[in-house]
Amino acid sequence: MTIEPRATADLVDDIGPDVRSCDLQLRQFGGRPEFAGRVTTVRCFQDNALLKSVLSEPGDGGVLVIDGDGSLHTALVGDVIAALGRDNGWSGLIINGAVRDASTLRTLDIGIKALGTNPRKSTKTGAGERDVPVEFGGVTFTPGDVAYSDDDGIVIVTP
């Protein structure tokens, strides 16, 4: 089921003061600046094997929220993994961590928000957790929530 993007400012106006918006100032890296979808989560630290495995599955228009504990030491997503997500139907990635291949990411039809960049590769041991609540930017991302993202920020809605 595809969830259409909506302007996050309009969502905030509609929801009011109890809105769940991410306070973390993530940068826009993907070629799709507005995206929305059901949340799937991964928690991993400087290791991207688990998130690559998840992005290998059909995304059905979902958003993968990746909590890399804010580390900018290694990139969790680069052009190959982002293209894998795009090819498997994910609408976007929200990353509490770093990406690489930034100039190529801008050309891919997938939304990507992250803290910053680092050309260093991550490890690939498969360490991490999937489908668990993750928290960053003052908001908890729970699997099954709906994430809306645009140039103004990220809003999370529980259906």
From Swiss-Prot:
- Group of enzyme by EC: lyase
Q: What's its EC? A: 4.1.3.17, 4.1.1.112
Catalytically driven reaction(s): 4-hydroxy-4-methyl-2-oxoglutarate = 2 pyruvate; oxaloacetate + H(+) = pyruvate + CO2
Cofactor(s) of this protein: a divalent metal cation
Locate the residues binding substrate: G78, D79, V80, I81, R100
InterPro entries, per database record: RraA (IPR010203), RraA/RraA-like (IPR005493), RraA/RraA-like_sf (IPR036704)
Name a single GO biological process.
Answer: regulation of RNA metabolic process
* Cofactor binding description: Divalent metal cation.
UniProt cross-references to Gene3D superfamilies, sorted A to Z: Ribonuclease E inhibitor RraA/RraA-like (3.50.30.40)
Binding positions (a divalent metal cation): D101
GO MF annotation terms: 4-hydroxy-4-methyl-2-oxoglutarate aldolase activity; metal ion binding; oxaloacetate decarboxylase activity; ribonuclease inhibitor activity
Per UniProt, the keywords (alphabetical) are: Lyase, Metal-binding
Question: Could you tell me what this protein does?
Answer: Catalyzes the aldol cleavage of 4-hydroxy-4-methyl-2-oxoglutarate (HMG) into 2 molecules of pyruvate. Also contains a secondary oxaloacetate (OAA) decarboxylase activity due to the common pyruvate enolate transition state formed following C-C bond cleavage in the retro-aldol and decarboxylation reactions.
Subunit text: Homotrimer.
Cited PANTHER family? 4-HYDROXY-4-METHYL-2-OXOGLUTARATE ALDOLASE 3-RELATED
What family does the Swiss-Prot or TrEMBL record give for this protein?
Belongs to the class II aldolase/RraA-like family.
- Identify this protein by name: Putative 4-hydroxy-4-methyl-2-oxoglutarate aldolase
